[in-house]
């Protein structure tokens, strides 16, 4: 079973991805992250996604949460995305990054970091539900790949 940590757990897309993870085969929730000081840190994710208590508490401690992860699903603003990308690369944890666009410097960081881990870029397609399922599908796929940078074109047919 693949264990996924989701960042931005207190946001709409984070909650949607978490809800879908509970209904997915072959992948499960290992943890949920939010930025330091977010009001939902310490909250059970089930309370946010309407499932009751799940035992998974939102944290702002990447190092502790990452110990449980086979993959990180990260789709919060770029500055934070790239922080988690660098941290994932240091620990060789694959990462799925949801994005609506990266500038030149951000793309350089992605390319450099993906040399040390596996990274897949998932563009936000405008439909949150489609994006959430694409992110989960990408997370299940990326853990079996060699180090490098990938995009959704690479997992077509999976």
Regions found by a protein language model. Give the residues of each.
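Short, aromatic/basic amphipathic alpha-helical patches
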Residues: 44-47, 109-111
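Rossmann-fold NAD(P)-binding glycine/threonine-rich loop
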Residues: 79-91, 97-120
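Glycine-rich, highly charged phosphate/nucleotide-binding loops
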Residues: 47-64, 73-81
